[in-house]
């Protein structure tokens, strides 16, 4: 009975972006087989990954698929799925946001890029993120120009003031 329910979970999980690319790896099928072999570990397999909040470019999707392939290969060799929930969590909290940022920020993104929705595997053309969102602590070119001009102006003013003080000092000295 639980195998039937487990099959439904894998059909839903098959739409996650981890399973969108590189069909030769057959990740969803391998994951289903691995979990069906480990009947006692039903709890670890039952947790379906939720990647609906993410969209990745093709290169990032291939990286995630390759990484998942390697993780599943280790689990198949060890015949253990206990680390599967922590892998899904790490992927969702660490790698997918990192890959999304890489795909939408310079230098990888120039103007627009095609991202694939992680819940539907459908590609959509999207605009790149603004530089301030990609690099929140950095300044854009206009702000850098203003900063440089301000510093230049301050040094110029200090130079003129220094010249005036020195000139008055020399006039006072020659007048004595």
Curated annotation (Swiss-Prot):
Q: Which residues lie on this side of the membrane: Cytoplasmic?
A: 167-176
The protein's name is: Sperm-egg fusion protein TMEM95
Where it sits in the cell: the answer is:
Cytoplasmic vesicle, Secretory vesicle, Acrosome membrane
User: Membrane: present as a keyword of the record?
Assistant: yes
Q: How does it sit in the membrane?
A: Single-pass type I membrane protein
Q: Which family does it belong to?
A: Belongs to the TMEM95 family.
* Reported function: Sperm protein required for fusion of sperm with the egg membrane during fertilization.
| Organism in which the protein naturally occurs | Homo sapiens
Query: What keywords sit in the KW lines?
Result: Cytoplasmic vesicle, Disulfide bond, Fertilization, Membrane, Signal, Transmembrane, Transmembrane helix
Expression (tissue specificity): Spermatozoa (at protein level).
Q: Which is a Gene Ontology cellular component entry for this protein?
A: sperm plasma membrane
Spell out where the chain crosses the membrane: 146-166
Q: How is it modified after translation?
A: N-glycosylated.
* GO terms under biological process: fusion of sperm to egg plasma membrane involved in single fertilization
Q: What is the effect of changing residue 73 to A?
A: Significant loss of sperm-binding to hamster egg membrane
Q: Which cysteines does the record link by disulfide bonds?
A: 17-118, 20-121, 105-128, 109-134
Extracellular membrane side: 17-145
């Amino acid at each position: 009975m639980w195998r039937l329910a487990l099959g439904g979970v894998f059909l839903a999980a098959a739409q996650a972006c981890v399973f969108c690319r590189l069909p030769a790896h057959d990740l969803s099928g391998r994951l289903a087989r691995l979990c069906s072999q480990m009947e006692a570990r039903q709890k670890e397999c039952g947790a379906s990954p939720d990647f609906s909040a993410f969209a990745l470019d093709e290169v990032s999707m291939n990286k995630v698929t390759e990484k998942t392939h390697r993780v599943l290969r280790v689990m198949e060799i060890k015949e253990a799925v206990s680390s599967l929930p922590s892998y899904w969590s790490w992927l969702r909290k660490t790698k997918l946001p990192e890959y999304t940022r890489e795909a939408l920020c310079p230098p990888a993104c120039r103007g627009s890029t095609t991202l694939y929705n992680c819940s539907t595997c459908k590609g959509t053309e999207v605009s790149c993120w603004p530089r301030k969102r990609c690099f929140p602590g950095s300044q854009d070119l206009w702000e850098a120009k203003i900063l440089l001009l301000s510093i230049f102006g301050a040094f110029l003013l200090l130079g003129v003031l220094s010249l005036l003080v020195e000139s008055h000092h020399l006039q006072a000295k020659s007048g004595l």
